């Protein structure tokens, strides 16, 4: 249900490659990674429902939630393990994170 809006339907192609992620200012653990490029490979994006759960946004002709947070769980649309320096830094901060 929440994966009902596919990027393929809107853009007629998958979102593959590098794109910037802008993290919410109220989460200072990740905020200074805003504007860094992360690697994306997907055809869908997640409709967050509750906007308070959005940790980061990416623009691909329109903004979409690319990182979500709820309690002690973080989910990303991008692949931090494939995102070189920015991804390593994101993973490091995730490991050090204390919700």
How does the language model describe each region?
Residues 1-11:
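Single conserved hydrophobic/aromatic residue that forms the stacking wall/gate
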Residues 9-99:
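Amide-donor transfer/coupling interface in amidating biosynthetic enzymes
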């Amino acid at each position: 249900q929440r994966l009902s809006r596919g990027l393929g339907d809107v853009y007629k192609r998958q979102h593959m490659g590098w794109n910037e992620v802008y993290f919410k200012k109220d989460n200072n653990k990740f905020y200074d990674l805003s504007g860094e490029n992360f690697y994306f490979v997907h055809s869908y994006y997640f409709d967050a429902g509750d906007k308070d759960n959005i940790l980061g946004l990416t623009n691909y002709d329109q903004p979409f939630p690319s990182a979500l947070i709820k309690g002690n769980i973080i989910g990303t649309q991008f692949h931090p393990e494939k995102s070189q320096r920015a991804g390593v830094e994101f993973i490091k901060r995730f490991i050090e994170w204390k919700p």
